[in-house]
Amino acid sequence: MKTYTENQIEEMRRISDETENLYSPYACRNAQACRQYYSKYDTEFVRSQFSVDADKIIHSPFFNRGSDKTQVFSFYKNDDITRRAAHVQLVSRIARTIGKVLRLNLDLIEAIAIGHDIGHTPFGHRGEFYLNEIYSANTGRFFNHNVHSIRVLQILSG
């Protein structure tokens, strides 16, 4: 584990504080990150918890399993059909651009953008629609792939 001098720590805190001071009043602050477990080595001013989340998502097997899947189902070969990996990258870039203009937390935006499709059902939104009908009829609740993405990352990845 790398140790930092007091001067380095102070400089990193200063930079982190300056960044947070640029946020809109509506932005989620890094200190608002909720964690089930905190590491004693967490250093907010080096990497925010949201940045750590984004890295965990990228390195999860669930993220990698979807990388070569298509966004839509096709009976014929079509090079113009987007793969999920490209879709997630595009969503992340667009979301970060919008977030930058609105002065929001870009680390949080990136984590949300890259993890938003992990809980997607087979056959995309149409599959989600049918699964939601079945789930709702049996439980009275609704299925949402965005919420299921969190469930997958929290429960299935341990």
Name each model feature, range by range.
Residues 38-45, 49-59, 63-86:
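Active-site flanking loop/helix segments enriched in acidic
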Residues 2-42, 59-64, 89, 93, ...:
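Sequence-structural signature of the catalytic-core scaffold of metal-dependent phosphohydrolases
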